[in-house]
């Protein structure tokens, strides 16, 4: 991390999904949840950053049509990715199937909380309430509620960031910063 010069993103006040785009990542559920979130918080955006085939119809989501979705469907270099993570409110991993995730450890290396689904080892990595929030997979209403709760309670985000910094300081996990 010390050698990476973060690039400031062109967007602000956003929630971040990053990593390879594929059907087991549950991005469509996140887009649907963000449709609900943006009705309540129209100043918040979703950044989806990573390379892969978009496997669902983006046009069905209001966030795509209103500009609340920023899609960076390409390879991101280290500087850009670190900048995106550092400047996000928090990271979301809405996976419908996973064993573990380098995305979580990358977020933690930069002290960012994670909203993740209860699949694979994610609940073990993201201790609910301590480093982020765990929600059931494919549960749009609960995912939207978890996102809204963090947006509306920045002190929760700050407390989670402090927990992550204490338990996962930048020096401990330098080798796994980039997913």
Q: Where in this protein do the model-derived segments appear?
A:
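Conserved donor-binding/catalytic core segment of Leloir-type glycosyltransferases
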Residues: 9-25, 31-34
